[in-house]
Amino acid sequence: MDTLWTVVNVVVMLILIGLLIWMQKKHVSFTKRVFTGLALGIIFGFILQWAFGTQSEVVSKSTDWFSLVGSGYVGLLQMVVIPLIMVSIISAIMNLKGRQNLGKMSGSIIAVLLITVAIAASVSIVTSLSFNLKAIEIQAGDREQAQGQKLEEKVGDVKDKSIPQQVLEFIPTNPFADMTGARRSSTLAVVIFSAFIGVAVLGIDRKKPEQAATFRKMVEAVYAVVLRIVTLVLRLTPYGILALITKTTATTNIDEILKLAKFVGASYVA
């Protein structure tokens, strides 16, 4: 019987996905399709929770199938992150004119980053005090507890290393491994490696302009391809949101969702 209900739930999910595809063919705006996927996911998830319960075998098997869409979408997003970071940084640096611009840009980026972080922290503090928010009110599920345990292990690893050792981890000793996210500092290492490539192109530009021009054309072509891939992945957002929200609402207690909604509301106010 559980298998039958699982099949029914999967068929319903396919129908909802078909509805979103129909909306796309009717040229409904992207924003409306995303919010439609969000609303359908919430409704379908609550129906599953009401009909079977959060811990039922039917919900577990159904959400496993839903993950083909939801987790698949997240995986595709992760796929484009590193290539997008690399080509964006390389393209930005190699198109600068002179080292002074590079220094000014670096200083401006750091200044803007520090200012925005300070503003965000201040707004968060004021909002949390205004709403009297306490994260302890939200009970963590098995997934959250497992993630918290992993985070504690990572924090422990950081504490065991001195500051010089932590700084040395930023050096991309194996940039190809860092592109796979092999280390905790892989993303920053990729950024540094990409910056080195951009600066190297500026150096070659003075001595061998023809080779630099050839490399620029190649990077511009790769950049265009990566942006196209990003566009294709983002078009899947309504379907990914539908599957992810359905799984979340079907496997999370309503009381905890309501508590979390308070935090979400406060976040929008902030």
Model region roles, listed by residue range:
Residues G37-Q55, T116-S122:
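A generic, lipid-embedded transmembrane alpha helix
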Residues V28-F46, L68, V74:
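Loop-to-helix transition at the N-terminal end of transmembrane alpha-helices
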Residues V58-W65, G103, I254-K262:
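Membrane-water interface of transmembrane alpha-helices in multipass transporters/channels
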Residues D2-V7, I21-K25, F35, V74-V81, ...:
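Signature of multi-pass transmembrane helix bundles
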Residues N9-I21, I42-F44:
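Hydrophobic core of alpha-helical transmembrane segments in multi-pass integral membrane proteins
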Residues R143-K150:
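Acidic, negatively charged sequence tracts
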Residues V58-L77, A177:
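Hydrophobic alpha-helical membrane-interaction elements
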Residues M1, G18-V28, A51-T54:
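Short, hydrophobic transmembrane alpha-helix segments
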